Amino acid sequence: AELNRRLADMNRELEASNDFLARISSKISHYLAPQIYKSIFSGQRDVTIHTERKELTIFFSDIKDFTSTTEHLQPEEITLLLNEYFTEMSAIAHNHGGTVDKFIGDALVIFFGDPETKGTVEDARACLNMATEMQRRLAELNVKWRRAGTEQPFRVRMGVNTGFCNVGNFGSMHRMDYTAIGAEVNLAARLQSIAEPGHIVISYDTYVLVRDIVAARALPEISVKGIGRMVVPYVVEGVLDEAGRKIEIFSEHMTGLDFYLDPRAVDATAIERIRATLRNAIAALEGRGGEDASAGTARPDQMDPGL
């Protein structure tokens, strides 16, 4: 009886210890990308300073004019918006197999190809599919935030590059960061910096991997520190359907207007309703134009040609 009692006590202590470790590991998981957490706690990866050379597709994004966009908001409001934005974007990245590297202020860094990969081509395609889905979701969030009283929408720039990088644990034995470094990472950041708000700019190395799923236009070549070649960026102008035809996505957000149209997502039964809504909106704008003219707005032929 005494032995059974001791065994029962030991089992309870063991269960309590396991529960404690499970809670701790669950908390730690929020500080790591899911793929990194899984590889460490499954024993597939050691927690040592070690890097590998791999071909990755790297994604950078930031919010254009974030400071001026949020200057009228309180810090608590900015925190809520950013956390919701990062939560939504991170979920999309995870669904497409991306590893969320880090958050830098309002910027987001993601890479494809480590620790899990489907091959260079599929990794690049997954990254572009992720980026376009992020654009769609951000358009929905901007509508939601505007209705909640946020005057200025988030206008996001995105840059994507594919190339060889060093990826793994960097830092010291006391504090490590699992990340990717190299000139190709810097190029992705540079492409993001030249993108117009609402657009995705990709390198030629990425373009050749995804040109069957996106329509893109070449921009003037640029030079990037650390890369001994001129780089030709491409701006993504839309996605392609199975027949290779470009599908345009329309998005515009400003005071008095929240407009987003993805023809692929429209149900056939809703097409006529959408057409009627657009016709009514145009008629309302034309009526507003007449009101402005009657109120003294100058006609085009009366305007100063120097303006």
Model-found features: residue ranges?
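Regulatory cytosolic signal-relay segments
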Residues: 1-53, 298, 302
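Catalytic NTP-binding/metal-coordinating core of nucleotidyl cyclase/transferase enzymes
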Residues: 15, 21-25, 29, 46-129, ...
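Conserved, well-folded catalytic cores of nucleic-acid-processing
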Residues: 31, 43, 118, 134-137, ...
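Short amphipathic alpha-helical segments
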Residues: 37, 41, 83-87, 188, ...
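Histidine- and acidic-residue-rich, metal-dependent catalytic cores
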Residues: 134, 159, 272
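Catalytic/regulatory signature loops of cyclic-dinucleotide turnover enzymes
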Residues: 161-162, 170, 183-204
